[in-house]
Structures are given as C-alpha cells and as structure tokens.
Amino acid sequence: MHLSFGSLFACLLASSTAVASAPPSNFDVANFKSADIIKRDVAVIGGGSAGTYSAISLKDKGKSVILIEKKGRLGGHAETYIDPATGTPVDMGVLVFHNITVVKDYFKRFDIPLNRADDFMKSEFYFDFRTGRAVTPTFTPQAEEVSAAFAAYLAQYSKYPGLRNGTILPSPVPEELYMPFGKFVEKYGIQAAIPSMYYFNPGVGDILSNPVIEQFRYWSSDMVRSVATGFLGPVRRNVSELYTRAEAELFQSSSLLLSSEVVHALRADGESGVMLIVRTPAGRKLILAKKLLIAFPPKLDFLAPFDLSATEKSLFGKYIDAGYYVGLVKNSGLPNNTSISNAAQGHTDFTFPYLPAAYSFAPSAVPGLQLVTYATGQTTKSLPLSDEAVKADIINTIKRIQKQNPDKFTSTEPEFVTFASHAPYNLQVRAEDIRDGFYDKLYTLQGQRNTHWTGAAWKGEDSSLLWTYSEEIVVPQVIEGL
C-alpha cells in the first residue's frame, strides 16, 4: 500500500470512525502551523523497551517514525542512578538480558559492549517484614533438585511452540494452561524450582494462584537457560546508556517527542491512516501517520484518548496487574555483603511473604546504598499504591528489622536517594478469560484501524524477548501494511 499524506488527511476526515471527544474540526490542518504538523510512516507511542526498539528497527529499515513518550526520558523500566560522589551507575528495574542474537545485535548497534552479568546475590537472611523477626525457610532444595524441576517444567512449556510468537494458544485452550500455577506445580512435582521463580521475578502478585499461562509468559525457555548458564549485561553496568544513545539518534533525525502525550486520536481502517494531536512542551503538534504502533500498557485509563472500539474496550477492560516499585536507600544499617529477603513462616510451603510488601534489600555497586524491590498483589487499578505510601512502608520495614535485630543491624534513619514506580506491571487476565479465548481475540487486533501493538502485555515482562517479538512479528506486520 502506498498512500500520500494529502490523501491520508482527506481519508481520515471522511471516515465515519471519529473520536467522540474530539470532532474532526479539531484535526483541521488550518489550526496548526506548518512547523507543528509532523508526517511520518509510523507513529510509535511509548518509549519503553519495546517502543524504543521498534522505532529504531523501523528507522533502520528505511521508514520514517515519530516516537512519543510521556516521560522526559526513554527506557521505561530501565532506570539507572548515577552516584554523584563516585560516578558509579546503579541499575534498577531492568538489570540483565538473555544471551541471544537480538540482544547482542541491539547493544552492538549502539557500540555498548556486553559481558556476563554478575550473579544474583543469594540471601543469607530471611525476615518477616511485617514484624522484623527472623524466619527460617523450611523448603531448601538442593541444586540437583532445582535442575530436575526446571527440566520437568520445560518439558511442559515446550508443548506450546506458539509462545515464541506471543501468547498463541491452542483452541480450545487446554485446562492445564488456565489452572492455578500451584496445582500445576503439584501435578508435575516441580516444587524445587518455585523459590527461584519467585525471587527472580518479583511483581507478579500471588505466583501460586496465577494461571499457568501467565507464568509461562515470563518463565520462557530462554529465561530458564539464562538462569542455568548466565545472563548478559553492559560492561559499564549502565543499562540506561542504551536508551540515552537511542534518544540522541532519534532526536537528531527529528523522530522523538519527550514529555509529550497524545490527547486526541483519529483512527480508521483502510488507507485512512491515523491522526494524533499531541501535547508537547513546545505546544500542540498534529501527527499524520500511515500506521500507529502502541507500546505502552493497554489499560483503559491510559487508552482514553485513542478512540477505542467496543472490542478493544471489552478486551483491555479485562486486564489486571500488580504494582511494582524499586528504589535505592541510604543509611539503612543493612549489610553490604548479603541480601535480605521477605518471608512469612508457615505461609505457603515456600514461606512466601504477604503482599503488598518489600521483596528484598540487596547491596548495590555503591557501598551504603541498598536496592529495594516492592510489590502488591493483583489488582484492577493501574496505580494501586501511591509512591509516598510505598516509600513509607519500606522505611518502616527497615526500622522494624533494626529494632528486632539490634545484634545484627545498626539503628539508623534510612532515606531514599531515588525511587521509581513501574506500575502497572505484569498485565494478565483471569482464568475464565483465558479459557474463553482472550489471547486469540487479543491478537486479532493487530493491524485493525491501522494500529499495531507491542509491549509486555503482548509477550511478557522481558526486554530480550520483547525485542525478539517486535523484530520478528510486529515490525514486519507494520511494514507490510505501509
């Protein structure tokens, strides 16, 4: 399909699919200076992992793009704190990557060297963060048992090759894919793998009640392999460098709008393309694009400006998610040589903690700074807790641990040096929705109304596999329709 931008504008205004909150007159080019009208092959909304990768990939393939990001930076969950005293970077959120071709090619493109990432530090201390008292884990499998359990897990995972291309499931969906993961664990005797699965992937809510397919979406064969053989990470231990370099390149080609937000959208099928009104620090911009690629979490409150169809509203309205938060704390009085994990004696066979709560505290690359992760259970709310409520709970948790263990930890006044909310995290749906074909219906949206979709909801919370999904599936679909 080859469409001029002049005909694109005419087609859109003639379309019967209009935005209820913004009549077509709002999109009249006469309301915009020529410098404020941006014409591109593809408009990408959301500058996180998948959106940034897709914009760069499309650009490399000769397509004109405009990437629109609400925040003042790219990277999404990839956040890096630079210690002002030493210049040492400390990554939060996204830490490591799989040793696969798409990862190595992407970092090489921006001249960022990789090597084997540091192993995750094993906890030597377990406390019930509700009380501050020490907990003794009752289930401590040996390495051989863990390996055998992961092998049994992979034997079941491998029955569903469609998982490489998203969440492509058999029809009808087998009951095994929507049963609670805890029942699946018992059925296949993979208990020894569960502590690793839980602590490697915080932010999923109640792992044992999650439907099996929601666990499969993150714990891919690539993830299991990386846990066994090692992950990759930037040599300079600064994941955000990837995004600052992508940001510089996109700015240079006038392909990026930061601190910007779509306020109205006009989408239609056929040759009509899409029109967007974007609020930017420099005023309103009118975007005329042949295709739209949405790469942020598809929650209804975030999608309000995008003129959703009844089908889109129905599907996206089914999502639940978890709150997930990260931060760095100084003056914690916690050790610099081991991590501390949350546990609750007698709660599940694995002494998993009650949520919402901090998962763990771990030493960072800067002595005296502790990396903390915190999460909630599943919720329909996109932003389940305020940042201030989470930070207050974390500080109170540290003080409880100090008070109950004066022989181990010094009493201090902890302070945050940085904090970030990654909510809504790990979008998923309930068992009955999976049974009723939610994912099959979801993927039929790709390409409708000149709109494509990528991001964790379409694959999983894993940057390496999001890049693979975007490169192998989504970007080719977008280009085919241009």
From Swiss-Prot:
InterPro entries: FAD/NAD-bd_sf (IPR036188)
Signal peptide (UniProt feature, chain positions): 1-21
EC number: 1.21.-.-
GO terms for biological process, alphabetical: terpenoid biosynthetic process
Residues of this chain annotated as glycosylated in UniProt: N99, N165, N238, N337
Superkingdom to which the source organism belongs: Eukaryota
Pathway listed: Secondary metabolite biosynthesis; terpenoid biosynthesis
Cofactor(s) this protein requires: FAD
GO molecular function: oxidoreductase activity
UniProt keyword terms in alphabetical order: FAD, Flavoprotein, Glycoprotein, Oxidoreductase, Signal
Family: Belongs to the beta-cyclopiazonate dehydrogenase family.
Function: FAD-dependent oxidoreductase; part of the gene cluster that mediates the biosynthesis of the sesterterpenes ophiobolins, fungal phytotoxins with potential anti-cancer activities. The first step of the pathway is performed by the sesterterpene synthase oblA that possesses both prenyl transferase and terpene cyclase activity, converting isopentenyl diphosphate and dimethylallyl diphosphate into geranylfarnesyl diphosphate (GFPP) and further converting GFPP into ophiobolin F, respectively. Other sesterterpenoids (C(25) terpenoids) are found as minor products of oblA.
Protein name, UniProt field: FAD-dependent oxidoreductase oblC
Organism the protein comes from: Aspergillus clavatus (strain ATCC 1007 / CBS 513.65 / DSM 816 / NCTC 3887 / NRRL 1 / QM 1276 / 107)
